[in-house]
Amino acid sequence: MHILIGGGSGFVGSALTARFRARGDKVTWVSRAPGPDRISWLDVAAGRVPECDVVINLAGEHILNLRRRWNDEYRRDLVRSRVGTTSSLVNALNAMAKPPAVFISTAGKCFYGTAEVAADTRYPELDEYSRPMAMDFPASMVALWEDAANAIDTARIRHVHVRLGIILGAVERVSLLAKLWRIGRGRGILPLIRLPFCLGLGAVMGHGRQPMPWIHIDDVVGLFEHLVDARASRGRYNAVAPGIVSNREFTELLASRLHRPITWAAPASLVRAVVGEDRASILLDGQNVKPRRTLESGYFFRYPELQGALQDLVQITI
């Protein structure tokens, strides 16, 4: 097959590319940077999309890019990098005489919004059939993103929509400067937080009860491969592991894996001051997201529980 990936040079795109090429598929990226086996977003806007079997769109600026200040300009860039690229790609695919068989669009678990939950109340379960709890900025952005993708011609193209949770990738043993350079560069959350944990500075975020819908990068790749090959799959699928944990549980399991203590909790006010109000909601206000349709589709998670995922991804030595 020929697979076109928008945003292929990112964390998820690189992992998907390696997997599809390993099984003999041809992969082309839509990218801002020139290079072999790539086309540009200008090519897409002009309708110069090569004939292909599958299109996967991952493009979008990282919302946790801590090198960017949280302001109106950054919020506009977040929306434009998602909605603009998706609309351009959808328009190009709809205009093709021979369109791809399947279009996989992506968004985030932020679709479900956030809501205040009392200390003695469980967070409501949210699956692919659930409506957003509230429309904060991340939820509004994702709604616009999904609306742009939903303009695809479903009479000719099978549309699969994946909502990604917090992606966990392998932690590489690199220098401190390299770690700092990669902050916000979309390599998953573990490389970002491992250093403070190793220094004994790992912390629970706020009250720590908020759910953290996570997924191992291998399961992200496995699910995309499954949805490409499963021709009956259509509609929304949550890319989150069945074994969801709270922020406190996540923090304690990671600290235990690294043989480090948890000595403090980061106050919500401090988190908001550092990363911005809307961005802080991603860390402080969780969503209890379940992969209902994902499991019903027949996908089998390699890493359904966090402990096994951390054992695979996190080296104990600093």
Positions of PLM-derived features:
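A conserved pocket-lining segment of Rossmann-fold NAD(P)-dependent short-chain dehydrogenase/reductase
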Residues: 129-133, 180-184, 189-215, 223
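Mid/C-terminal beta-alpha module of Rossmann-like enzyme folds, strongest
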Residues: 227-277, 311-318
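NAD(P)H-binding glycine-rich loop region in Rossmannoid oxidoreductase-like domains
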Residues: 35-88
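Glycine/proline-rich active-site loop of Rossmann-fold NAD(P)-dependent oxidoreductases
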Residues: 116, 155, 168-191, 226-237
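Conserved beta-loop-beta element that borders a ligand/cofactor-binding pocket
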Residues: 107, 147-173, 178
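Conserved Rossmann-fold NAD(P)-dependent oxidoreductase catalytic core, especially the SDR/UDP-sugar
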Residues: 87-136
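C-terminal amphipathic/interface module of NAD(P)-dependent oxidoreductases
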Residues: 281-318
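N-terminal Rossmann NAD(P)H-binding glycine-rich loop of SDR-like oxidoreductase domains
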Residues: 3-21
